Amino acid sequence: MNVPTTRKDLMIVNMGPQHPSMHGVLRLIVTLDGEDVIDCEPILGYLHRGMEKIAENRTIIQYLPYVTRWDYLATMFTEAITVNGPEQLGNIQVPKRASYIRVIMLELSRIASHLLWLGPFMADIGAQTPFFYIFRERELIYDLFEAATGMRMMHNFFRIGGVSADLPYGWIDKCFDFCNYFLTRVIEYQKLITRNPIFLERVEGVGIIGREEVINWGLSGPMLRASGIQWDLRKVDNYECYEEFDWEVQWQKEGDSLARYLVRIGEMMESIKIIQQALEGIPGGPYENLEIRSFDREKEPEWNDFEYRFIGKKSSPTFELPKQELYVRVEAPKGELGIFLIGDQNGFPWRWKIRPPGFINLQILPQLVKRMKLADIMTILGSIDIIMGEIDR
């Protein structure tokens, strides 16, 4: 009697670049043995727009609207890094009020980014209800952004030496109201999700990254802090005025998808604490360093004072980058967002190298999904939190 032999043919499956769970135009070539993942190869570049080369052909002022298209869900951070580099190169002082406004906007943007991570992440693993809840709170944040900047997304709010406009009348009270309301909503999320047995079954022990591994791969943000390393650039670098606020770095030691979820939930609570302290202590004074608004008079015809007072539109300020090089970074919602900037005494940067956190965090995905089930790919990919705009640039 012949014993039937089982077939061991491997199946190759393309996930994306249009798959609804791909969080953008990411393509995964997955090799499967039944339900088990044998190999996974990410294919990037579908959203490449040449952002670094564009930067080298624009002044900083002209380039600011472009940077909001990197991570289009946390645009305040891309704006912050774009102005922080020239400010440090040119030794430009930012007024205290402008720094407080920046911190408030950055932390609101962090909450909005984490909310739009939480909803699709829960939808990926089968829970649809939180997906609708998070939009309720996110719209309130966008209402605040719209009142302060004029735009719900792509704000174009940061400027070299400050911000583009002061906070409007009544905005601080509205922001206080949102903070008090949002704390109750986060508690609701925790009741709904954190102890849910089906949720725990899907995320606990899935996609574990060890402490040594996370350092060797160069991961950052919640990916790093979920593996037991208390590293947050807001504490380490003390940029803007974060050292003036009382808050704690959120971290876990398990290193799995559940730990990454808990870190982000904790970060939203800490962001509210920072915002409340900034709103209470925001000083008076100017919202931008007016000395930076310099014009290259030699290239323009002579203007008299009368015309300057009544002219509708002035020419763009020309800021020459000193002949130096600098690496500057901020703690974005997804990790360490940095730029390596080289100036050569010109209005255009000589080199503008972007360090996107999502691109580096994504590199560990093939290792995490090997020997896991096909359904776990969505859980692990969702817990990494990627945006293809900043990965492909």
From Swiss-Prot:
One of its GO terms (molecular function) is NAD binding. It is an enzyme of class 7 (translocase). PROSITE patterns: COMPLEX1_49K. Disulfide bonds: none annotated. It is found in: Plastid, Chloroplast thylakoid membrane. InterPro entries: NADH_Q_OxRdtase_suD, NADH_UbQ_OxRdtase_49kDa_CS, NDH1_su_D/H, NiFe-Hase_large. One of its GO terms (cellular component) is chloroplast thylakoid membrane. It is a peripheral membrane protein. Coiled coil: none annotated. It holds the Pfam family Complex1_49kDa. It catalyses: a plastoquinone + NADH + (n+1) H(+)(in) = a plastoquinol + NAD(+) + n H(+)(out); a plastoquinone + NADPH + (n+1) H(+)(in) = a plastoquinol + NADP(+) + n H(+)(out). One of its GO terms (biological process) is photosynthesis, light reaction. NDH is composed of at least 16 different subunits, 5 of which are encoded in the nucleus. This is NAD(P)H-quinone oxidoreductase subunit H, chloroplastic. The lineage of its organism: Eukaryota, Viridiplantae, Streptophyta, Embryophyta, Tracheophyta.
